[in-house]
């Protein structure tokens, strides 16, 4: 009964209106910045990938831009990139991946706007070099009235709740399921180990979360992509057929599992919703991590937001989908594991279980940071709120190991929609600031403009 109710509410909030709003908002920012990901691609690459090989002193303090984007990627590159892609293929057919791509391309500029505003309106902790920011700050400061404050509070409440579903239960449930299937580890042991590890990260605060993600994200990404590369190399002759399925299935009424006249919209809805679950463009949560960056230019940190969506969806999710479709394994949440096992035997299944565990744990680390920032914003003077949140978060991590994944995924989709709507409203209101900052940056020839933390 509970699962049916959550699924019904999720479908209502992820209706045609929400899908259209998400796509139109992304198109608005893409067109308003002159199709920046395409027309300014050399600058974006130079200021992101190219900057990794340059050493610079940051005037604003904080963590490095790469460390910030690693933390954000830790939150976005969770089980949705592996388990979620298989589920999307089962629910929406191969065409759902095409709509995931469309949503990701437009979502790049939505994420860019979020990150730019988060860095522009970030604040410095009193008596410390640490920086904090995110939607609750750019909403309340950028819209300095009762409506803005109410919207900021609403975002924080939904983000804190989402940290229990998307950020803890979904991720730890996937870890427990993967380790039980591949290594026969009981869920109780997984729950105990994850609770201890997450408690260790929580105890270390923002610095420990950022350091852990900076080390974990590049390692887990390469590890997983190598495994997918082996699968694709084995079925390389089937890759063109897989791409054809994705493109043709996007416009076929009977492409989705639902079939019939509603199949087209089901494919689109599943692709957009699952895509947002992975890249989080429009949700605003990842901008909390970007706001910790000591980047002197909000625009340049916004470029890292574009990079984040590309890596998460265009790269990792696409590789997952191609590996599943090319290997022709049964579609579903465990499709990627079936593909790995088909090619590499039991060792492949174990390899994917490790990859799922790494992706999911990185997501847990990032979301515990997001949730804490929201609680600190809601209860700035409370000594009990943060310890209580941490206790509840750890409880959620343990409970996720025993939860039913379909129910948790539906709850995650529901809370994502609750996050999306107030954040998109704020982004549209604050869009003139995004366009002005972008024009000013490129009018100066793409040079850095210092943005002091408040």
Give the label of every model feature segment.
Residues 36-63, 87-89, 93-97, 109-146, ...:
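Flexible loop linkers connecting adjacent transmembrane helices
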């Amino acid at each position: 009964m509970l699962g049916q109710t959550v699924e019904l509410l999720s479908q209502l909030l992820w209706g045609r209106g929400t899908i259209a709003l998400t796509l139109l908002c992304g198109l608005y920012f893409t067109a308003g910045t002159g199709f920046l990901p395409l027309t300014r691609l050399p600058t974006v690459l130079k200021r992101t990938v190219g900057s990794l090989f340059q050493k610079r002193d940051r005037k604003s303090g904080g963590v490095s831009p790469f460390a910030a984007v690693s933390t954000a990627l830790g939150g976005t590159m969770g089980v949705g990139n592996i388990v979620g892609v298989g589920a999307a293929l089962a629910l929406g057919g191969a065409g759902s991946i095409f709509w995931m791509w469309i949503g990701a391309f437009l979502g790049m500029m939505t994420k860019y706007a979020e990150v730019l505003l988060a860095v522009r309106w970030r604040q410095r902790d009193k008596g410390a070099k640490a920086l904090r920011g995110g939607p609750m700050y750019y909403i309340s400061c950028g819209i300095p009235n009762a409506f803005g404050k109410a919207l900021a509070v609403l975002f924080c409440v939904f983000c804190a709740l989402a940290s229990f579903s998307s950020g803890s239960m979904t991720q730890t449930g996937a870890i427990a399921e993967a380790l039980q299937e591949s290594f026969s580890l009981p869920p109780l042991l997984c729950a105990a180990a994850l609770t201890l590890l997450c408690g260790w990260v929580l105890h270390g605060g923002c610095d420990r979360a950022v350091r852990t993600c900076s080390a974990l994200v590049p390692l887990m990404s390469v590890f997983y992509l190598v495994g997918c590369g082996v699968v694709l190399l084995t079925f390389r002759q089937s890759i063109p057929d897989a791409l054809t399925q994705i493109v043709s299935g996007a416009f076929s009424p009977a492409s989705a599992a639902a079939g019939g006249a509603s199949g087209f919209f089901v494919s689109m809805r599943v692709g957009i919703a699952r895509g947002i679950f992975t890249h989080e463009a429009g949700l605003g949560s990842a901008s909390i991590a970007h706001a910790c960056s000591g980047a002197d230019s909000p625009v340049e940190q916004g470029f890292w937001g574009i990079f984040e969506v590309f890596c998460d969806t265009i790269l990792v999710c696409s590789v997952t989908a191609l590996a599943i479709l090319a290997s022709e394994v049964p579609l579903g949440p465990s499709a990627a594991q079936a593909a790995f096992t088909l090619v590499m035997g039991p060792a492949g299944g174990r390899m994917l279980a490790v990859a799922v565990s790494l992706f999911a744990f990185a997501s847990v680390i990032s979301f515990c940071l997001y949730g804490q920032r929201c609680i600190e914003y809601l209860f700035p003077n409370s000594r009990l709120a943060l310890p209580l949140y941490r206790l509840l978060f750890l409880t959620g991590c343990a409970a996720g190991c025993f939860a039913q994944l379909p129910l948790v995924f539906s709850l995650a989709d529901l809370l994502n929609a609750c996050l999306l709507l107030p954040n998109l409203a704020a982004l549209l209101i604050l869009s003139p600031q995004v366009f002005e900052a972008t024009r000013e940056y490129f009018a100066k020839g793409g040079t850095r403009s210092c943005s002091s933390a408040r």
